[in-house]
Amino acid sequence: MAPDPVAAETAAQGPTPRYFTWDEVAQRSGCEERWLVIDRKVYNISEFTRRHPGGSRVISHYAGQDATDPFVAFHINKGLVKKYMNSLLIGELSPEQPSFEPTKNKELTDEFRELRATVERMGLMKANHVFFLLYLLHILLLDGAAWLTLWVFGTSFLPFLLCAVLLSAVQAQAGWLQHDFGHLSVFSTSKWNHLLHHFVIGHLKGAPASWWNHMHFQHHAKPNCFRKDPDINMHPFFFALGKILSVELGKQKKKYMPYNHQHKYFFLIGPPALLPLYFQWYIFYFVIQRKKWVDLAWMITFYVRFFLTYVPLLGLKAFLGLFFIVRFLESNWFVWVTQMNHIPMHIDHDRNMDWVSTQLQATCNVHKSAFNDWFSGHLNFQIEHHLFPTMPRHNYHKVAPLVQSLCAKHGIEYQSKPLLSAFADIIHSLKESGQLWLDAYLHQ
């Protein structure tokens, strides 16, 4: 039987703390009971998951596991957070128990924690506010230039097209900037990060911050882990992803789509369709279904501003055409950039590996250049971003050599490639996994 939470908490804080083994912790990973370990302390999060500020699922994905490194990675004020966690404390690991499970590489984990301490001493977790101010200003300038294009040159085809391209750049770049605020990587307090996150994602993009938090934090916690990373939820209903999952799907004789042709239909239902045909409508369902009225209010300000700005110039019909062309262009930009770092990498069920191995097997980089940095919002440094999600993006290139050294020492592949090669690898990986599915479907 599980220990009584009140009694266990009292025992944990008294002179004789309650001790647990990893087997006991691992058993508490289901819907009824959820425990996790941080710095050898055992916490009962069964009731807390619904109140977790980062979302119920992201913390639940570590139920029954050690969560020390993700805890450090995601929180910017760990001391304050730990005070709130005291009410969840039920004991600690027995002295003879290792600090984390045998599936995790101890030497690699210890050295990564030393690297993190070095990074903090170097000041690489501190943001340059001028960088982010200039980044916001460049987005606002592009936004203004889009409107001025129609106002000055009229609404004929070429000005209309240029306006659409500029607005798609605004949307893409605002997407990268909201990502910075969402990860708490700009300000030292959560309050200001959250406020600017609402402004950028809500007012400049028309999307809800709560939806982004709910989806994106899960992705970072368990990247490319089936049923834990929502970014690969298109498996199996639209695509067969990864070698392991594709073969598994084929052996089960499941066929929701002709996966052996997925590298072809990706161009139809992937980049052009994700935002205008799915996200555009789902975000409203999300905020209304979950009663996220603050998010909805921020979103409405975007649509009101966009409507009042462009309808007087274009009329309603052309305005709607402009809106969906922008969403179409933005969708292509967004999908190619976000998928190039993950789809070609290892995709599997959660194997409860250490933090570094979890992130490195699921991510790759794209070579640094001024264009690549701007075009991808510095997500060409995906490895560094995943290891240090609250690090300001302008410091990724500074920590990259240290990460490469750590990977080389432990025989971990650190992948970095040209931008076009990264795009091509998406198609190559889809073709390969589709063929693996077909072979397993027909012959195994």
Curated annotation (Swiss-Prot):
<dbReference type="InterPro" id="IPR036400">
    <property type="entry name" value="Cyt_B5-like_heme/steroid_sf"/>
</dbReference>
<keyword id="KW-0256">Endoplasmic reticulum</keyword>
<feature type="topological domain" description="Lumenal">
    <location>
        <begin position="143"/>
        <end position="145"/>
    </location>
</feature>
<feature type="transmembrane region" description="Helical">
    <location>
        <begin position="146"/>
        <end position="170"/>
    </location>
</feature>
<keyword id="KW-0812">Transmembrane</keyword>
<dbReference type="GO" id="GO:0046456">
    <property type="term" value="P:icosanoid biosynthetic process"/>
</dbReference>
<feature type="topological domain" description="Cytoplasmic">
    <location>
        <begin position="171"/>
        <end position="267"/>
    </location>
</feature>
<feature type="short sequence motif" description="Histidine box-3">
    <location>
        <begin position="382"/>
        <end position="386"/>
    </location>
</feature>
<dbReference type="GO" id="GO:0045485">
    <property type="term" value="F:omega-6 fatty acid desaturase activity"/>
</dbReference>
<dbReference type="GO" id="GO:0000248">
    <property type="term" value="F:C-5 sterol desaturase activity"/>
</dbReference>
<dbReference type="Pfam" id="PF00487">
    <property type="entry name" value="FA_desaturase"/>
</dbReference>
<feature type="transmembrane region" description="Helical">
    <location>
        <begin position="268"/>
        <end position="288"/>
    </location>
</feature>
<feature type="modified residue" description="N-acetylmethionine">
    <location>
        <position position="1"/>
    </location>
</feature>
<feature type="topological domain" description="Lumenal">
    <location>
        <begin position="289"/>
        <end position="305"/>
    </location>
</feature>
<keyword id="KW-0249">Electron transport</keyword>
<dbReference type="GO" id="GO:0006355">
    <property type="term" value="P:regulation of DNA-templated transcription"/>
</dbReference>
<keyword id="KW-0275">Fatty acid biosynthesis</keyword>
<dbReference type="InterPro" id="IPR001199">
    <property type="entry name" value="Cyt_B5-like_heme/steroid-bd"/>
</dbReference>
<protein>
    <recommendedName>
        <fullName>Acyl-CoA (8-3)-desaturase</fullName>
        <ecNumber>1.14.19.44</ecNumber>
    </recommendedName>
</protein>
<feature type="domain" description="Cytochrome b5 heme-binding">
    <location>
        <begin position="17"/>
        <end position="94"/>
    </location>
</feature>
<dbReference type="GO" id="GO:0036109">
    <property type="term" value="P:alpha-linolenic acid metabolic process"/>
</dbReference>
<keyword id="KW-0560">Oxidoreductase</keyword>
<dbReference type="GO" id="GO:0007267">
    <property type="term" value="P:cell-cell signaling"/>
</dbReference>
<dbReference type="Pfam" id="PF00173">
    <property type="entry name" value="Cyt-b5"/>
</dbReference>
<dbReference type="GO" id="GO:0016491">
    <property type="term" value="F:oxidoreductase activity"/>
</dbReference>
<feature type="transmembrane region" description="Helical">
    <location>
        <begin position="122"/>
        <end position="142"/>
    </location>
</feature>
<feature type="transmembrane region" description="Helical">
    <location>
        <begin position="306"/>
        <end position="326"/>
    </location>
</feature>
<feature type="topological domain" description="Cytoplasmic">
    <location>
        <begin position="1"/>
        <end position="121"/>
    </location>
</feature>
<dbReference type="InterPro" id="IPR012171">
    <property type="entry name" value="Fatty_acid_desaturase"/>
</dbReference>
<dbReference type="GO" id="GO:0005739">
    <property type="term" value="C:mitochondrion"/>
</dbReference>
<dbReference type="GO" id="GO:0016717">
    <property type="term" value="F:oxidoreductase activity, acting on paired donors, with oxidation of a pair of donors resulting in the reduction of molecular oxygen to two molecules of water"/>
</dbReference>
<dbReference type="GO" id="GO:0006629">
    <property type="term" value="P:lipid metabolic process"/>
</dbReference>
<keyword id="KW-0276">Fatty acid metabolism</keyword>
<dbReference type="GO" id="GO:0016020">
    <property type="term" value="C:membrane"/>
</dbReference>
<keyword id="KW-0813">Transport</keyword>
<keyword id="KW-0496">Mitochondrion</keyword>
<dbReference type="GO" id="GO:0045595">
    <property type="term" value="P:regulation of cell differentiation"/>
</dbReference>
<keyword id="KW-0444">Lipid biosynthesis</keyword>
<dbReference type="GO" id="GO:0043231">
    <property type="term" value="C:intracellular membrane-bounded organelle"/>
</dbReference>
<dbReference type="GO" id="GO:0062076">
    <property type="term" value="F:acyl-CoA (8-3)-desaturase activity"/>
</dbReference>
<dbReference type="GO" id="GO:0009267">
    <property type="term" value="P:cellular response to starvation"/>
</dbReference>
<feature type="short sequence motif" description="Histidine box-1">
    <location>
        <begin position="179"/>
        <end position="183"/>
    </location>
</feature>
